[in-house]
Regions:
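A short hydrophobic beta-strand->loop->alpha-helix junction that borders the nucleotide-binding pocket
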Residues: 8, 52-53, 83-84, 137-140
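Conserved G1/Walker A P-loop phosphate-binding module
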Residues: 1-59
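Conserved protein kinase catalytic core
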Residues: 26-27, 57-58, 89, 115-116, ...
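Glycine-/small-residue-rich active-site loops that bind phosphorylated ligands and cofactors
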Residues: 2, 56, 85-86, 113-114, ...
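Conserved C-terminal guanine-recognition region of P-loop GTPase G domains, centered on the G4
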Residues: 44-45, 67-134
Length: 169
């Protein structure tokens, strides 16, 4: 019994690069049932990996958001890719996914770009605030992929800290 691993993130956070890093070459791209939206599925260690459209939320205001929400609800675990440079914007989606109660792991991507802009993110603190494993990655340079694969096994439902919720709202 393989798990369903679903990748979720805002547009342009590097999700497809993660998808390729996890699944390798064999990718099956089809349309979501009843739509023209592409859905990519691949395999990773006997699990199924599904990429979702880039969305800013899952409140189902748009077709993409509704579909992403349905896919997340059917997932065994979620890898939420967030952009370290736009952390606050991206955490809005992270918190919505946490609300759905699905075990997840956060890939904090583009930490190299964030560092260039002088942004240093305290990963341990973020992990505490979200209640899920957080992995720093710079996936275009292949940084953090192995650690992510390692930590996927420790995915768990989040427990966001009240302080964080206040900051984001």
């Amino acid at each position: 019994g393989g798990k369903k691993i679903v990748l979720v993130g805002n547009p342009n956070v590097g999700k497809s690069v993660f998808f390729n890093a996890l699944t390798g070459l064999y990718v099956d791209v089809s349309n979501y049932p009843g739509t023209t939206l592409d859905m990519a599925c691949g395999r990773y260690n006997g699990d199924v990996v599904i990429d979702t459209p880039g969305v800013y939320g899952v409140s189902s205001f748009s077709e993409e958001e509704g579909i992403t929400r349905d896919i997340v609800l059917a997932a065994d675990l979620v890898v939420n890719v967030i952009d370290a440079v736009h952390l606050e914007r991206d955490l809005f989606l992270t918190l919505q996914v946490i609300d759905m109660g699905i075990p997840m792991v956060v890939a904090l991507n583009m930490v190299d770009e964030a560092a260039r802009e002088g942004l240093k993110i305290n990963v341990d603190l973020l992990e505490k605030l979200l209640g899920v494993p957080v992995v720093s990655t710079a996936v275009v340079h292949n940084v953090g992929i192995e650690e992510l694969k390692e930590r996927i096994r420790f995915a768990r439902p989040g427990q966001p800290d009240d302080q964080l919720l206040k900051k984001i709202e």
